[in-house]
C-alpha cells in the first residue's frame, strides 16, 4: 500500500498520464486490498477530480482479469511478509554469526527473498504473456536486481526495476550537509545499476557544480557523532561520487564494514545491525495509526 500510494500518487499528479486512466488494484489479502483502494480513491478525488477509474480484484483466481489489457503493471509485493519471513531472514543467519542491516538486496537475506518471490513472479509473467503481452512490468519489489534480472532473462515480459532512492538522493545529501539553500532549481544526473546508482553530476540553479562544496563538507560530517549517513560520505572520499542507496544498504554491499572481528568499524560508521526489522515494526504501527 505504501508503494501504491507513492507510485500511483505520482501518476495522479501527472496530467499527461491521467486522461482515460484506469487503475486496477490486485491483492491476495482482502484487508490490504481495501486499504489500497480507499487510499487511491481518495488521492484520485483530491488530485484528479475523480476522473480515473479505480478497480479492485481479490485472489489468484481473478489475477488474469486484473491484468487483462494493461499497459503498465506495477509490482510491489512481499512474499512471506515481515512475520515470519523477514524475521527468519535475520534470525537464522544471526545464529551463525552473519549479521545484516537491511537484507533485502543481496547476501543471505536477499537470496532467501529471491527464492520465495521468483515463483510468484513467474506466475505473473505467465499471465501477462497471455493477457497483456505488450505491457511494461515496473518492479518495485526487492531484491531488485535478482527479480528484475529473472524477469528479463527468463520471461518474455518487458521489465524495468524501480526504487524511490533515486528521487530522494540529492535532497537527502544536501540537507544532511547543511546545503538546503541549493535545493531549489538544482539539476542532477544519476546513473548505475538499480539499488546502487550514483549521483554523477549535481548543479545549482545557476549551473554551478556543487560537488566541490559537497566534498569540502564531508569530513566534518564523518567526524560528527550525531550524523548517521557515514558510509556513503566515505564513498565520496574514495570514489568521488555519492551513492543513491542508504548507508545501511551500502554497509552490506561492501564487505569492509560488517566484520565480527572488527566491531569498531560498526561503531565508527554507526552501522545499525538489524535495522530493517526495526523499520518494519515502526512502519506497521505507523500505518495502523494513519
What are these regions (language model features)?
Residues 16, 158-178, 186-189:
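Catalytic or ion-translocation cores adjacent to nucleophile or general acid/base/metal-coordination motifs
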Residues 44-71, 78-81, 100-106, 114, ...:
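A structured beta-alpha segment of the ubiquitous adenosine-cofactor-binding alpha/beta core
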Residues 3-8:
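N-terminal Rossmann-fold NAD(P) dinucleotide-binding loop
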Residues 2, 32-42, 52, 147-162:
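Conserved N-terminal glycine/acidic-rich loop preference
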Residues 95-153, 158-164, 170:
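Rossmann-like NAD(P)(H) cofactor-binding subdomain of soluble oxidoreductases
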Residues 178-290:
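Long, compositionally biased stretches enriched for glycine and/or charged residues
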Amino acid at each position: 500500500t505504501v508503494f501504491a500510494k507513492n507510485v500511483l500518487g505520482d501518476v495522479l499528479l501527472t496530467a499527461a498520464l491521467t486522461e482515460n486512466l484506469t487503475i486496477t488494484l490486485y491483492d491476495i489479502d482482502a484487508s490490504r486490498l481495501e486499504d489500497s483502494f480507499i487510499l487511491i480513491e481518495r488521492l484520485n478525488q483530491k488530485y484528479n477530480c475523480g476522473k480515473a477509474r479505480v478497480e479492485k480484484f481479490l485472489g489468484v483466481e481473478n489475477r488474469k482479469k486484473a491484468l487483462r489489457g494493461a499497459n503498465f503493471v506495477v509490482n510491489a509485493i512481499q512474499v512471506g511478509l515481515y512475520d515470519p519471513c523477514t524475521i527468519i531472514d535475520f534470525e537464522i543467519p544471526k545464529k551463525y554469526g552473519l549479521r545484516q542491516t537491511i537484507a533485502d538486496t543481496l547476501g543471505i537475506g536477499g537470496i532467501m527473498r529471491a527464492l520465495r518471490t521468483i515463483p510468484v513472479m513467474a506466475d505473473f509473467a505467465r499471465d501477462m504473456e497471455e493477457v497483456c503481452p505488450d505491457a511494461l512490468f515496473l518492479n518495485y519489489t526487492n531484491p531488485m536486481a535478482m527479480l528484475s534480472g529473472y524477469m528479463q532473462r527468463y520471461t518474455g515480459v518487458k521489465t524495468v526495476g524501480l526504487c524511490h532512492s533515486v528521487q530522494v538522493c540529492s535532497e537527502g545529501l544536501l540537507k544532511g550537509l547543511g546545503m538546503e539553500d541549493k535545493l531549489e532549481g538544482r539539476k542532477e544526473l544519476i546513473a548505475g545499476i538499480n539499488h546502487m546508482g550514483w549521483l554523477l553530476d549535481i548543479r545549482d540553479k545557476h549551473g554551478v557544480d556543487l560537488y566541490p562544496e559537497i566534498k569540502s563538507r564531508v569530513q566534518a560530517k564523518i567526524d560528527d557523532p550525531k550524523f548517521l549517513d557515514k558510509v556513503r560520505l566515505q564513498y565520496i572520499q574514495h570514489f568521488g561520487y555519492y551513492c543513491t542507496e542508504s548507508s545501511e544498504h551500502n554497509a552490506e554491499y561492501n564487505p569492509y564494514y560488517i566484520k565480527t572481528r572488527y566491531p569498531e568499524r560498526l561503531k565508527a560508521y554507526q552501522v545499525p545491525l538489524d535495522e530493517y526489522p526495526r523499520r518494519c515494526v515502526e512502519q506497521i504501527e505507523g500505518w495502523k495509526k494513519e
